[in-house]
Amino acid sequence: MSLEDELLQQRIPVALKKQMTPGPTVYTLENRRGRWVNIFGRLKPGIAPAQAKASLQPLFHSILEMEVQQQEFSRASAYTREEFLRSTVEVLPGSRGGALLGTMAGAPLWVLMALVGLVLLIACANVANLLMARAGGRRKEIAVRLAVGARRSRLVRQLMVESLLMAICGGAAGTLLAYWADRFLVSFLPSDIPVRLSGAPDPRVLAFALAASVLTGIVFGLAPALQATRVDLHSALKEEGAAIAGGGHARLRKLLVVTQMALSLLLLIGAGLFIRSLRNLGSLDPGFRTANVVVFSVDPSLSGYTGPQTQLFYRQLTEKLRALPEVESASLGLVRVLDFGEWDSTVTVEGYEAKPGEDMNPFYNGVSPGYFATLGIPMMEGRDFTAADAGGARKVGIVNQKFARRYFGDRSPVGRHFGFGGDPGIKTDIEIVGVVKDAVYQNLRDPIPRQVFVPYEQRNNFPSMTVYARTRLDPRRAQAAIRGIVHGMDPNLPIYDMRTLATQVELSLIFDRMVAFLATVFGALATLLAAVGLYGVMAYSVARRTREIGLRMALGASNRTIVWLVMREALLLFGAGAAIALPCAWGLTRLLRAQLYGIAPGDPLSLALATLALAAAAALSGYVPAFRAARIDPIGALKYE
């Protein structure tokens, strides 16, 4: 699977940035703090990226120290200055790129790679067990070959070739399955991300699959091959020495089953943790009502609108949307909720003395009147913005509960003032007229931030706005009417990222959902492989112990006794695997802490449920051979060779 950038269709001089995005923005060549340009350079031979970073960091830090002396930093708080000076330069291989998708999906993909590795180990252990069982059936054949002069090394090579052929065929089948699965995985990603996942065969992936197949075939085929050629010719030629004990392979085969059980339990525990984490995120109250809301973005500056024209366009747009019979209310917001973006700004709060280095940068959003009603965010105190606030004669703002608690404690913030900026002479001329309930901002995982809302027309430096429309019916059915209003006002104005707010919430959980689903699939697959491996060992053991079982039954052992004899061995193998896995899980799941939400890595319920699930699979795998053992005819068993 590879990434294909759909946005990079043309290359233009960076000096044309203003002409390509004519609206006001911080991402300009003149703004020294707006970092939006990536610098590409070719390193000298023998120079690693880490060495280049070590050389560039002192130069970068000197540039930062020079920048904080500029006039535009005069209003910045001490916290902003300190955070700015802590910035570091990043030197990355060009092949990795700087895509947002890679940044967001990096950690989840590493988790999935670890899970895939565990499944591969379980599958390899299973195949090794099957090879050993097959070698046991060929014990006399191998003994005859050795007896007539065949070299052991030649027999090992023959068995290794068989193992490699099996591994390569399995790798080829897996590659075909992966090609089909790629298309299924793409369905987890939103269709409007600026990259496209291609399922076309990649030579590097194919080479890795071939190398992994050959390597696993060698590593996990060598031990069975060596074990198969290490035979006692005298006993093997007489077909003796294994009828009761199960053969010299028994201990190694049981060890492989114990390993499979341990790894499967680790996967099931991980799957349980991810499922419960996703459930916690899905049941989280975002602070607003997601049902029946359509959200989209427009940028009138792309059609040549200026500042006053832009404000008029937005006023007319919201009025026309509210007039639609399908729409209950409509409003604007500068920052789209749950879009992984943010805008913060340094503030000075009236009557609050900031401590040295204290974070005075709440998240900021410019909104229109009715924004909170449209999103369903309750007003806890004071009032909403009105059309009269747009003029700017009286600067007003609304804060959330966390902002109010942080700077005003138990006192009411309504009627108090704050200002944007951190220098001692800043004017605190923005009056707080309301307090709204806390709501999420960037994504569901982050703690609720301190938030400041102002009328977008008072600080409208950005023509691109997000439009929210609460509908009276299914929002998907209202989208056509909403598009008609926008295109009726300006047929050439593009509409970006139109979707329902519920879909926006779902997209914010896209990687959590993908990891939880795939972890569950891998856990189920691992359990199936481990169960098959245990069944194979127990069936082989019952076949080898046919005479013993017949003798026990002839001496009076009941069917229940025979069933328990086999079941006990199966449960002991499971117990040994669980005894290894549970302490390991207690430590290894700590590595997943950053990927979990609302659940401890060592959650007892997840550990217990995973253990019970695997115990049930182990019991079922042991019961089938046990049931067959109980149906053995004692007379026929005593004649068994």
Placement of each model-derived feature along the sequence:
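Short juxtamembrane loops and helix-capping segments at transmembrane helix boundaries
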Residues: 2-25, 68-73, 93-100, 151, ...
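Small-residue-rich transmembrane alpha-helices
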Residues: 90, 128, 164-233, 273-276, ...
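Alpha-helical transmembrane segments of integral membrane proteins
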Residues: 97-101, 130-157, 161, 181-305, ...
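C-terminal transmembrane helical bundles of large multi-pass transporters
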Residues: 445, 481, 485, 489-582, ...
